[in-house]
């Protein structure tokens, strides 16, 4: 529990140093600052706070032989960025703790770290590497960041959580790794699909997306 608390506090401190609330400020509208518009990131942020706590609490609201958890943290990272994702994921865990009476405080803290903060942080680092060393186009963003990156980040984070003591009850290590691998793929498929939809139809909801970077003309040598 002390490891999870230290990770959560460190991540929250670093995120707050980035002043993430600036991303939610009003912006100049068609009439300039006299006609401000709300930040487009408010929509995905509120959607995460409404939907994701139920997803995290669901395994504790019913009794199943194999309790599997869906993360969603890489998707949150793609939508609102790491500085905002950190407090939002911690709040998600707190809401899930309130929704599920069977969820203990230690389990809720572990959920915040190993289901939320760690995969989101790994996804941020993966995204920085992809932007630095891979081609800049829409397919690379959707496939490497939305799909493949999510699979790898969620799986690695779940293995780290297992190493830290958050194991699946009544399941041996080999079967547990297989279950976590399969759940990472479900995370990847869902995140990749939603990333593709949002990038095409609601790009202003995706904080990590940039038309200037990923929609360069085909003849540009930097593409």
For every predicted segment, state its role.
Residues 14-22, 96-161:
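Short helix-perturbing small/polar motifs within transmembrane alpha-helices
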């Amino acid at each position: 529990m002390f490891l999870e608390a230290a990770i959560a506090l460190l991540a929250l401190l670093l995120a707050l140093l980035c002043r993430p609330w600036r991303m939610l400020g009003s912006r100049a509208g068609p009439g300039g600052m006299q006609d401000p518009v709300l930040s487009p990131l408010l929509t995905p942020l509120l959607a995460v706070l409404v939907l994701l706590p139920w997803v995290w609490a669901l395994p504790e609201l019913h009794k199943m032989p194999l309790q599997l958890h869906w993360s969603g943290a890489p998707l949150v990272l793609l939508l609102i960025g790491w500085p905002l994702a950190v407090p939002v994921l911690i709040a998600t865990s707190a809401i899930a703790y309130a929704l599920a009476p069977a969820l203990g405080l230690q389990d809720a803290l572990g959920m915040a770290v190993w289901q939320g903060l760690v995969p989101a942080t790994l996804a941020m680092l993966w995204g920085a590497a992809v932007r630095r060393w891979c081609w800049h186009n829409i397919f690379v963003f959707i496939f490497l960041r939305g799909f493949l990156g999510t699979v790898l980040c969620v799986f690695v984070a779940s293995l780290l959580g297992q190493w830290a003591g958050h194991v699946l009850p009544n399941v041996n290590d080999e079967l547990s790794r297989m279950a976590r691998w399969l759940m990472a793929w479900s995370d990847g498929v869902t995140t990749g699909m939603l990333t593709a939809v949002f990038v095409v139809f609601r790009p202003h909801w995706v904080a990590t997306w940039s038309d200037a970077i990923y929609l360069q003309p085909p003849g540009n040598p930097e593409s």
